[in-house]
Amino acid sequence: MTADTEPVTIGALTRADAQRCAELEAQLFVGDDPWPPAAFNRELASPHNHYVGARSGGTLVGYAGISRLGRTPPFEYEVHTIGVDPAYQGRGIGRRLLRELLDFARGGVVYLEVRTDNDAALALYRSVGFQRVGLRRRYYRVSGADAYTMRRDSGDPS
């Protein structure tokens, strides 16, 4: 099978994936502050976080993570990251990863930040019920890019 026809599976992200996640971050967040492997290892070690990966032919081609906020219900959640290998973008992998995060957060309000110029991500988030609730100026420290804060209510069925 070729990369175009190899099935993509979604499953748990592990510490063994940290290096590949960092490699993808470096491709995806050029000019910003991509996470190194140690950051992924810290995220994966937290009991409040849930991370998933997308694999094609045994290669990690995408990742996503969310954190549960607070110690007692009702919980709120924050999407920490979603990334898909540029060679695999446009195939619905980001949507599948996001769906896994939203399933984990079922019943809770979910927040995220997204670059104001990331039209593809903004369209994806809107399509599953996220709404803009704020603007964070110079949120991305290295590039100085702005971010929207978005929120998806707990009752959103999408």
From Swiss-Prot:
- Quote the gene name from the UniProt entry: rimI
Task: Look up keyword RNA-binding and say if it applies.
Answer: no
Task: Report keywords, A-Z.
Answer: Acyltransferase, Transferase
| Statement: the UniProt record of this protein carries the keyword Nucleotide-binding | no
Q: Which SUPFAM superfamilies match?
A: Acyl-CoA N-acyltransferases (Nat) (SSF55729)
Which InterPro entries does the record associate with it? AcTrfase_RimI/Ard1, Acyl_CoA_acyltransferase, Bact_Acetyltransf, GNAT_dom
Question: Example GO molecular function term?
Answer: protein-N-terminal amino-acid acetyltransferase activity
Q: What is this protein called?
A: N-alpha-acetyltransferase RimI
Residue spans crossing the bilayer:
none
Please list the reactions this protein catalyses: N-terminal L-methionyl-L-alanyl-[protein] + acetyl-CoA = N-terminal N(alpha)-acetyl-L-methionyl-L-alanyl-[protein] + CoA + H(+); N-terminal L-methionyl-L-seryl-[protein] + acetyl-CoA = N-terminal N(alpha)-acetyl-L-methionyl-L-seryl-[protein] + CoA + H(+); N-terminal L-methionyl-L-valyl-[protein] + acetyl-CoA = N-terminal N(alpha)-acetyl-L-methionyl-L-valyl-[protein] + CoA + H(+); N-terminal L-methionyl-L-threonyl-[protein] + acetyl-CoA = N-terminal N(alpha)-acetyl-L-methionyl-L-threonyl-[protein] + CoA + H(+)
- Its Enzyme Commission number(s) read 2.3.1.255, 2.3.1.258
The Swiss-Prot or TrEMBL record describes its family as follows: Belongs to the acetyltransferase family. RimI subfamily.
General function of this protein: N-alpha-acetyltransferase that specifically mediates the acetylation of N-terminal residues. Able to mediate acetylation of a wide variety of N-terminal residues, with preference for hydrophobic N-termini. Acetylates GroS/GroES and GroEL1. Able to acetylate the ribosomal protein bS18, but it is unclear whether it acetylates its N-terminal alanine residue.
Describe its assembly.
Monomer. Interacts with TsaD. Interacts with GroS/GroES.
Question: One GO biological process from the UniProt record?
Answer: N-terminal protein amino acid acetylation
Q: Which residue numbers delimit the N-acetyltransferase domain?
A: 8-155
Which CDD domains is this protein grouped with? NAT_SF
**Gene3D superfamilies on file:** 3.40.630.30
Which domain of life, per UniProt? Answer: Bacteria
Please name the top-level EC class of this enzyme. Answer: transferase
